[in-house]
């Protein structure tokens, strides 16, 4: 019996909606952040744009390197937390991510807004119930991120449609 069969249809549909939202956040949030900050700054409200620019002022890396550093660090912490054989493993992963994020911001390696983007992406990936789908999303997220960095929204859209064509031919 599926767990969604044991609850009311309204709650089941709400859970499905949350999982679909988590899937899209996992796949597209880092790519959209890079595309908007690199190519489409006019879509950001002026006050928010000033806040993003001022937080990135002291960061020496381009935005793609900054994002890759944080995404790879998050994936390493996630894998490390899974390999610790006890109930304390996930707790160590969360505390490690908090400490690493705080240290990276204080050292001006990454901007605070990027910590928020990577955190939301990581939390959304935990809401995907199937391991193989979650793993696939982790890989495809990097592809969309590179396409967003290279071509903006156009690259993300092209990658999405190519991905749909590949999936429809399976």
Language-model features: where?
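Short, small-residue-biased leader/transition segments that mark boundaries at the very start
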Residues: 2-3
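Membrane-interfacial loop-to-transmembrane-helix junctions in polytopic alpha-helical membrane proteins
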Residues: 7, 11-14, 18, 81, ...
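Hydrophobic alpha-helical transmembrane segments
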Residues: 10-35, 55-64
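Generic detector of multi-pass transmembrane helix bundles and their immediately adjacent loops
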Residues: 32, 42-170
